[in-house]
């Protein structure tokens, strides 16, 4: 008998689907949260010891703690079979054990996923044969879990994850197993396509609303965008990161589950290291941790007093970013920032006072005022009134 304990996200459930296609009724699968795995593993090992059974155990997309690390060693030394397959770099130390198989990226530089690693492992060890449909499915899971879908605009990968969240785990699992075992190609049926189109519209409305709720602050040395959200963390983190490139990372708080999701679009930030400070982990661009007392104070209590950042005006005709006529910004404290080009450099005027520091590019000047003052591009009518007032003052000085 095989047992597979996996994460309860798309990549984790993808492992369960692959395992059921390989082992059929001979595998028992349980999906766990990050915090729930260790209790599950401990219970399995205790029951195995009591019954003197040595079933094979797969652990995928999750890592065990030190106590279970030792217990798994004892189980293997007693004749039990264990294989832990993961792709998070925070689990690389488990490769010290013969039962550990942790690989962050392939030889060609592509990032791995637990589903793609398990699929490759089962094929290599003769447990299953590859198919076109499974190749396509596991690749979509990998692309979504590693954010590669966003880089190459692979919307099918995102839609697969959307479908995963629209269905129960049991229903999603059953649909995928039936489809992958009876078709040569992976596809969404007509009903799913319509359902996913409606979901796209719903997500877009949700992202627009949450964009207006984000606050900005410094947490230690990093400039962070903080927002409370229960859904669509990947899409939200990606959108907020792209719209606010001056932010080092986005922290998405889910108070119901007492979890924080950390997302970044930058290569110079590794949010798995940040999550590691608070007992969490994950990938360089997507990680998470529990809301401990320390995390609550930093990301909830202190941020609660801060007003949300106003989004940049997006329907302007005149007040445009990088315009030769200048660009006008304002923050919640009613401070005004006028960015204008002069002698091949960009200058900043704060409340009418031109600053000594200049910038080689508009993006650098905007990054400075957004990061340090949480400024936002104002609407055209405010910009036109500002120009009219400055023109009036200039004419008065000439007189």
Swiss-Prot record:
Highest taxon in the source lineage: Bacteria
Disruption phenotype: No visible phenotype. Cells show normal growth.
Record Gene3D superfamilies: 3.10.310.30, inorganic pyrophosphatase (n-terminal core)
UniProt-listed Enzyme Commission number(s): 3.1.-.-
InterPro entries: DHH_sf, Nucleotide_metab_enz
UniProt note: pH dependence: Optimum pH is 7.5-8.0.
SUPFAM superfamilies from the UniProt entry: DHH phosphoesterases
Residues passing through the membrane, by range: none
Subcellular location per the Swiss-Prot or TrEMBL entry: Cytoplasm
Record's GO cellular component terms: cytoplasm
Coiled coil: none
Keywords recorded for this protein, A-Z: Cytoplasm, Exonuclease, Hydrolase, Nuclease
EC category name: hydrolase
Cofactor(s) in the UniProt record: Mn(2+); Co(2+); Mg(2+)
PANTHER family documented for this protein: 3',5'-CYCLIC-NUCLEOTIDE PHOSPHODIESTERASE, OLIGORIBONUCLEASE NRNB
Record's function text: Degrades RNA oligonucleotides with a length of 5 nucleotides in a 3'- to 5'-direction. Less active on shorter RNA oligonucleotides and on those with a length of 24 nucleotides. Prefers RNA oligonucleotides containing adenines rather than cytosines.
The protein's name in its UniProt record: Oligoribonuclease NrnB
Organism of this sequence: Bacillus subtilis (strain 168)
């Amino acid at each position: 008998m095989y047992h597979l304990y996996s994460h309860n996200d798309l990549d984790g459930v993808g492992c369960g689907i692959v395992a059921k296609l390989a082992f059929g009724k001979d595998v028992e699968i349980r999906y766990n949260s990050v915090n729930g795995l260790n209790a599950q593993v401990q219970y399995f090992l205790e029951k195995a010891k009591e019954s003197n059974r040595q079933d094979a155990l797969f652990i995928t997309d999750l890592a065990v703690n030190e106590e279970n690390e030792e217990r798994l060693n004892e189980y293997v030394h007693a004749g039990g079979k264990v294989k832990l397959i993961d792709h998070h770099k925070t689990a690389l130390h488990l490769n010290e054990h013969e039962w550990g198989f942790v690989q962050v990226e392939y030889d060609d530089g592509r990032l791995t996923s637990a589903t793609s690693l398990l699929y490759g492992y089962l094929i290599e060890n003769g447990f299953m044969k590859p198919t076109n449909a499974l190749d396509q499915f596991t690749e979509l899971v990998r692309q979504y879990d590693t954010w590669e879908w966003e880089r190459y605009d692979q919307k099918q990968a995102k839609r697969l994850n959307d479908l995963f969240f629209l269905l129960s785990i049991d229903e999603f699992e059953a649909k995928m197993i039936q489809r992958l075992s009876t078709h040569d190609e992976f596809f969404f049926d007509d009903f799913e396509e319509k359902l996913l189109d409606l979901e796209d519209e719903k997500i877009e409305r949700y992202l627009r609303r949450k964009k207006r709720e984000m606050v900005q602050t410094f947490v230690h040395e990093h400039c962070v965008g903080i927002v409370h959200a229960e859904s669509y963390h990947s899409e939200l983190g990606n959108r907020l990161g792209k719209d606010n490139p001056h932010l080092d990372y986005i922290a998405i708080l889910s108070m119901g589950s007492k979890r924080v999701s950390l997302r970044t679009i930058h290569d110079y930030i590794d949010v798995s290291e940040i999550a590691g400070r608070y007992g969490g982990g994950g990938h360089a661009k997507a990680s998470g941790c529990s809301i401990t007392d320390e995390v609550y104070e930093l990301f909830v209590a202190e941020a609660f007093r801060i007003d949300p950042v106003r989004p940049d005006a997006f329907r302007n005709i005149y007040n445009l970013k990088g315009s030769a006529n200048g660009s006008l910004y304002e923050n919640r404290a009613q401070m005004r920032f006028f960015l204008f080009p002069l002698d091949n450099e960009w200058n900043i005027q704060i409340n009418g006072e031109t600053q000594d520091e200049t910038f080689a590019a508009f993006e650098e000047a905007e990054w400075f005022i957004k990061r340090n003052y949480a400024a936002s591009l104002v609407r055209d009518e405010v910009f036109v009134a500002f120009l009219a007032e400055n023109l009036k003052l200039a004419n008065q000085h000439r007189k």
